[in-house]
């Protein structure tokens, strides 16, 4: 380990910054954010540094660097464009026992500045030992997306109860277990969402109860159309916190790999006419698991409120007083259309888009065909693979031309994606001959003509295939 990671308390400590350019400005911002009493030595200052000096946030020492300026300093930063000056600052600081950083010169530095994720009082630092700063910044950018701003609020909330928790749980292990239950789950969500009053009341209740009766919750999460890169940050965080996950056939296997490793997995089916669990049983299972104090992830393909029966599930949760949260996902229609190069609306082709389901109810496809066959619109059919022939014929029987462009997109947004494009007359045969199976969507409308020109997604030579009618 080349550098020992520490955090310095610099509030009201004297620090010297040598240099007045843009690089020095970046260092000044960090030092001021830490509360340092900052002096900047340089003949001239960049405009923003000069503005900070005018406002009294730092002191400008006009002129050139001299060793005596280091006297009484706690920390020094050399940020000029002159390597000799920077090295002189480093040598003089070393001689006085002052921590010194030389920008872009780890060898001359006694300390380096890491890439920082600031969720004060929570701080995360990432460093590459000064060898590849760009890599550290890249990792910081990834972590930024996984650590919401609300974590700072959560850290302050926890700090305010630290003494009370320590008094209630003298045993270190018991205290740790208590904090683990508090810092993940509904109480933490309430804090991060700004409902601190409710969180405080719940926290006081839990402390008084000795941490018993951990409250469970259900997270209804849209997993998107299949590509893990299309998950929302919130969805990913909840997937990695869940104690148990209920998933169905429409959730891509790649997405399940992102669920917490030790989470219990419950397959609930939902394939056409082959449900591992009936919907009522799924609803009740969500209630039962939450009542056991578990964080339950109900993971659904696409968006839970678009033909996902999410409304039925949370209605049951609400009836039983179970805490729940809904995380929207990219609905399959949006994902499939975008990755197949088929705009759902287009000024020249379609002024509206309609989503329908191709599932039969009471033995027939009960849709408003008069509305669906109007010109200048796109119709997207969910769950229509098994009824494709009937659907396409119904479009024609109700007024759409048999030559109307139509497409089916299978396993949209994944490497297994296949798109077959044809017409209402030809599509069922194309789907059958190419073995198109669920999960797949059918898109009907003139916008399908654009797929030949706008199809862009192809991970490799053999993935994301587009098949056009001969």
UniProtKB/Swiss-Prot annotation:
One of its GO terms (molecular function) is NAD binding. Pathway: Cofactor biosynthesis; adenosylcobalamin biosynthesis; precorrin-2 from uroporphyrinogen III: step 1/1; Cofactor biosynthesis; adenosylcobalamin biosynthesis; sirohydrochlorin from precorrin-2: step 1/1; Porphyrin-containing compound metabolism; siroheme biosynthesis; precorrin-2 from uroporphyrinogen III: step 1/1; Porphyrin-containing compound metabolism; siroheme biosynthesis; siroheme from sirohydrochlorin: step 1/1. The active site is at residues 248, 270. Residues 216-470 are annotated as: Uroporphyrinogen-III C-methyltransferase. NAD(+) binds at residues 22-23, 43-44. Residues 1-203 are annotated as: Precorrin-2 dehydrogenase /sirohydrochlorin ferrochelatase. Transmembrane segments: none annotated. Pfam families: CysG_dimeriser, NAD_binding_7, TP_methylase. In the N-terminal section; belongs to the precorrin-2 dehydrogenase / sirohydrochlorin ferrochelatase family. In the C-terminal section; belongs to the precorrin methyltransferase family. NCBIfam families: cobA_cysG_Cterm (TIGR01469), cysG_Nterm (TIGR01470), PRK06136.1 (NF004790), PRK10637.1 (NF007922). This is Siroheme synthase. It comes from Chromobacterium violaceum (strain ATCC 12472 / DSM 30191 / JCM 1249 / CCUG 213 / NBRC 12614 / NCIMB 9131 / NCTC 9757 / MK). The lineage of its organism: Bacteria, Pseudomonadati, Pseudomonadota, Betaproteobacteria, Neisseriales.
């Amino acid at each position: 380990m080349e550098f020992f990671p520490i955090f310095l308390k610099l509030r009201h400590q004297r620090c010297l910054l040598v240099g007045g350019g843009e690089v020095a400005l970046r260092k000044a911002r960090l030092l001021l954010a830490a509360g340092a009493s900052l002096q900047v030595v340089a003949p001239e200052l960049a405009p923003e540094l000069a503005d900070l000096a005018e406002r009294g946030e730092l002191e400008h020492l006009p002129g050139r660097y001299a060793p005596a300026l280091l006297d009484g300093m706690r920390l020094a930063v050399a940020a000029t464009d002159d390597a000799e000056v920077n090295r002189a600052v480093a040598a003089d600081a070393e001689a006085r026992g002052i921590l010194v950083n030389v920008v872009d010169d780890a060898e001359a530095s006694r300390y380096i500045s890491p890439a920082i994720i600031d969720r004060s009082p929570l701080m995360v630092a990432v460093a590459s030992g000064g060898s590849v700063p760009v890599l550290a910044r890249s990792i910081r950018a990834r972590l930024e997306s996984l650590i919401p701003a609300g974590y700072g609020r959560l850290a302050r909330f926890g700090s305010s109860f630290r003494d009370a928790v320590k008094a209630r749980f003298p045993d270190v292990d018991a205290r740790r277990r208590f904090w683990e239950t508090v810092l993940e789950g509904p109480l933490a969500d309430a804090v991060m969402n700004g409902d601190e009053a409710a969180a405080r009341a719940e926290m006081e209740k839990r402390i008084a109860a000795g941490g018993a009766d951990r409250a469970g919750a259900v997270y209804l999460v849209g997993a998107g159309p299949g590509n893990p890169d299309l998950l929302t940050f919130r969805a990913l965080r909840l997937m990695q916190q869940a104690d148990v996950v209920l998933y169905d056939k429409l959730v891509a296997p790649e997405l399940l790999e992102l669920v917490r490793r030790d989470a219990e997995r419950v397959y609930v089916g939902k394939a056409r006419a082959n449900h591992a669990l009936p919907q009522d049983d799924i609803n009740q299972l969500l209630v039962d698991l939450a009542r056991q104090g578990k964080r339950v992830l109900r993971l659904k393909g696409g968006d839970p409120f678009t033909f996902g029966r999410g409304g039925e599930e949370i209605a049951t949760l609400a009836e039983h007083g179970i805490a729940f949260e809904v995380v929207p996902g990219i609905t399959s229609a949006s994902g499939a259309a975008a990755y197949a190069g088929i705009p759902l609306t287009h000024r020249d082709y379609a002024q509206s888009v309609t989503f329908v389901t191709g599932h039969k109810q009471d033995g027939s496809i009960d849709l408003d065909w008069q509305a669906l066959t109007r010109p200048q619109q796109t119709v997207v059919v969910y769950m229509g693979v098994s009824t494709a022939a009937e659907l396409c014929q119904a479009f024609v029987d109700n007024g759409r031309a048999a030559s109307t462009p139509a497409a089916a997109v299978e396993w949209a947004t994944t490497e297994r994606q296949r798109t077959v494009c044809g017409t209402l007359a030809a599509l069922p045969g194309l789907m059958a001959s190419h073995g198109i199976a669920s999960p797949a969507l059918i898109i009907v409308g003139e916008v399908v003509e654009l797929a030949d020109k706008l199809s862009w997604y192809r991970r490799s030579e053999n993935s994301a295939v587009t098949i056009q009618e001969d």
